[in-house]
Amino acid sequence: MLKLLFALCLISLATDSIAEDRFGGEPGEVRVYKTSAGAERKLELYFPPGHDPEKSTVPGLILFHGGGWSGGTLDQFRTACAYFASRGLVCATAEYRMLGKGEKPPKGQSKKGVCVTDAKSAIRWFKQNAGELGIDPDRIITGGGSAGGHISALATMNPDLNDPADPKDINTKVVAYLWFNPAFAPEDQKNPEIDILTHLKGDIPPAIVFFGDKDKWKTDWHTAYAKWKELGAKNIDLRIAEGQKHGFFNKGPWRTVTLIEADRFLVKQGLLTGEPTLVMPATGEKMVAAP
């Protein structure tokens, strides 16, 4: 009987957790950006109201979900994409190949490297189809949450890990980053291809980074942050949420707070205009700018 009650409690906790962590947001327009390992890799597109690609071009934003390089879904950034599309960007949230438990990567590749390769393909597809989408390929923003933050960083900083089928004349350079507690793991140093520290440069495009002060990944972020500053980077805007853990931006008022701060950051970079259309929560949550 006690075992049954314990099991029911675990189910209840799991259900409550799922209910709290629902990302929300409607799916965007689905496109296939490549086929790898026999499966279609898709992204979802969101357009500004009344956007006419034949009459105007706007900046593009492509985001990558988290999930430990082996899980996660597109719905993590659907709300963000819908919001930034309403503000004037063409947005995409892209999936990528994830290796399940016990599944080995192709010979000569790593579990995380496979993710990065697909992310590079997604960014290239976004740029290659700029005319149809009505975006400026020279004003692309990227980012992601947790593992997605790591993947977006390596996809734009590491010149290797390319899919041979990708167009070689299209690069993965971007003009800004939106990083939501990016996960830079210390064990990555064993593999330079996926190690952020190997690919840091002082001329990083402007970035805004969100972390909870109780996030276990924050220490590893600070290692990269310190090296970036040593290299002369001065355009990384680090924001800290007091009392918050990893993934805090996914739910409740913190999602709104981080989207507003990201909006203001993009306005500062000349990639958006006007004021955020979201309203800061009345409950008083706010981010603290880190030195």
Show the residue positions of the predicted features.
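Conserved alpha/beta-hydrolase "acid-adjacent" motif
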Residues: 216-222
